[in-house]
A protein has these predicted regions:
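Glycine-rich beta-alpha loop elements in corrinoid/cobalamin-binding modules
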Residues: 1-106
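Conserved alpha-helical substructure of the radical SAM core
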Residues: 172-201, 251
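N-terminal pre-triad scaffold of radical SAM enzymes
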Residues: 141-169, 194, 203
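Catalytic cores of alpha/beta
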Residues: 277-278, 342-358
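N-terminal [4Fe-4S]-dependent radical SAM core
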Residues: 85-154
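Hydrophobic alpha-helical scaffolding
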Residues: 2, 114-118, 151-158, 172, ...
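Conserved SAM/AdoMet-binding glycine-rich loop
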Residues: 192-335, 339-343
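Conserved, mostly hydrophobic/aromatic
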Residues: 128, 161, 165, 186, ...
């Protein structure tokens, strides 16, 4: 599957169950008629599958009742690097709102990518996160995993990101529409973490962008053709109550057995600047010395290609962060994520970034 996979996996399981009823009791070693499979997997949103290239007429404009969009072939991308970029742009445009099938040939085989599955509802997310996950590494891992303790005590509040940054896979996996868990579900998870050995400190609370819990579109998202809810400016239809996010964090902090709650990364700084009260709380109450955020670069031409806000809001955020940290008697630091070698970023751009860091 592609995307988060729960709906696709459920659909696959139901179809396999139907096959079992059709063919009767079989040993796992007995072959099943191969003619069943091509039709069995057709039309499942959020999946990719391989078919024979010859099975798709060269002039076909539709498949499985949906419009067919052809991407540059694998061989074309190897021969002409620009084709890889063109294919990536087409893929991204179709992933968010598409009801079309994407096809990419590779010799005698073609990958078919179905339209994305719908995001899970709040009730479905709550049911998923209520499952008894062990929060331990898979037994196949023999060596220690450095991040495992941090991950084991973190809480996902929502999926999706309105940022739509052009380099980021999160919106491709989870979509730009925010799907949020209920406060009750999040607090139940906080209780379970608090009951764990050394579970008193919750390392991170949030999602792809930490301050988008509960966000929604006030307009009609089915008609939206924007690449980003945030760029070039925050869409007037993007609605989020950041103070509700702060109230949620305070309720998590008040959970019996919880000693510390942190938002360690992912605060969208241009959005945070829209609510000074919430930003002061993120900084003073829920930052544990360091906050990781993602300006990615400092050169306007590169930031435009990335669909990132300019340096003016980032520097305004830094000033506010220092001011609110000092007001709470804390010495804290912002750790910036920065990117090199982005398509369109030149050596001269990187020298400008180096000069900015050194200043």
């Amino acid at each position: 599957s592609c995307g988060m996979g729960e709906r696709a996996l459920l659909d696959v399981a139901r179809r396999l169950d139907a096959v079992a009823e059709l063919v009767g009791d079989l040993s796992v070693l007995e072959p099943v008629d191969g003619e069943l499979w091509p039709d069995l997997w057709a039309g499942i949103p959020g999946t990719a599958r391989l078919v024979k290239t010859a099975s798709i007429p060269s002039d076909a404009e539709e498949l499985d009742g949906l419009e067919l969009v052809r991407l540059p072939s694998h061989d074309e991308m190897l021969a002409v690097p620009r084709a890889y970029l063109d294919g990536t742009v087409r893929l991204e445009r179709e992933t968010h709102q598409s009801r079309r099938i994407l096809a990419q040939p590779n010799g005698d085989r073609t990958v078919l990518l179905m339209p994305p599955a719908a995001p899970l509802t709040t009730e479905e997310l709550d049911g998923l996160y209520a499952l008894p996950f062990s929060r331990r590494p898979h037994p196949s891992y023999k060596e220690p995993i450095p991040a495992v303790e941090m991950i084991a005590t973190s809480i996902t509040t929502h999926r999706g990101c309105g940022g739509g940054c052009s380099f980021c896979s999160l919106a491709l996996h989870q979509g730009r529409r925010i799907a949020s868990r209920s406060e009750a579900s999040i607090l139940d998870e906080a209780k379970r973490i608090a009951a764990m050995p050394r579970g008193g400190s919750i390392s991170d609370v949030g999602g792809p962008s930490a301050n988008m819990w509960g966000a929604a579109c006030r307009l009609d998202p089915s008609k939206c053709r924007r690449d980003s809810c945030m760029y070039p400016s925050i869409c007037k239809g993007f609605s989020v109550d950041q103070r509700a996010c702060i109230d949620l964090l305070r309720d998590v902090q008040a959970t019996p057995g919880v000693k510390h709650v942190r938002v360690a990364s992912g605060v969208r700084f241009d959005l945070a600047l829209k609510d000074a009260t919430a930003l002061a709380a993120y900084t003073g109450e829920f930052t544990g010395g360091q906050l990781k955020i993602a300006p990615e670069h400092c050169v306007p031409d590169v930031l435009d290609l990335m669909r990132k806000p300019g340096m003016k809001p980032f520097e305004a955020f830094l000033e506010a962060f220092v001011r609110y940290s000092e007001a709470h008697g804390k010495e804290q630091y912002v750790i910036p994520y920065l990117m090199s070698a982005f398509p369109g970023c030149t050596d001269a751009h990187m020298r400008q970034l180096g000069d900015w860091l050194a200043a």
